[in-house]
């Protein structure tokens, strides 16, 4: 579960850059990139550190999303969007889908291991 949570922070950090925001990246951020090996969990930050970075990145992202203009959303994306428009808008839409997919994985794993549900 820790890898998925770290991957979500990694992805949100990337989205902050795509929408023109700035956030200080943690040195461990690249441990959670797409295709990263999960062999050495001892190098991972603890869940509290990941959670704290999630909050920081999310605050910056929400502020920047609320500031975006239609013109900015229509600009080409610096991220190669696998499906949909190759614009900032398309990147936001794709990464929103990506995030909900992984949050669903976390919810399923929590249930499987007997933890309380994430919400509700």
Features from the language model and the residues they span:
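Short, contiguous alpha-helical
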Residues: 1-37, 78-120
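Acidic/histidine-rich alpha-helical segments that form the ligand environment
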Residues: 37-75, 90-95
């Amino acid at each position: 579960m820790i890898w998925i949570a770290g991957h979500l922070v990694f992805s949100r950090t990337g989205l902050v850059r795509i929408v023109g925001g700035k956030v200080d990246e943690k040195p461990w951020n690249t441990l959670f990139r797409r295709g990263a090996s999960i062999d050495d969990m001892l190098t991972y930050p603890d869940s509290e550190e990941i959670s704290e970075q999630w909050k920081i990145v999310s605050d910056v992202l929400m502020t920047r999303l609320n500031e975006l203009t239609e013109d900015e959303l229509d600009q080409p994306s610096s991220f190669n969007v696998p499906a949909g428009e190759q614009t900032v808008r398309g990147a936001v839409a794709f990464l929103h889908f990506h995030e909900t997919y992984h949050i669903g994985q976390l919810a399923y794993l929590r249930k499987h291991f007997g933890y309380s549900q994430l919400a509700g």
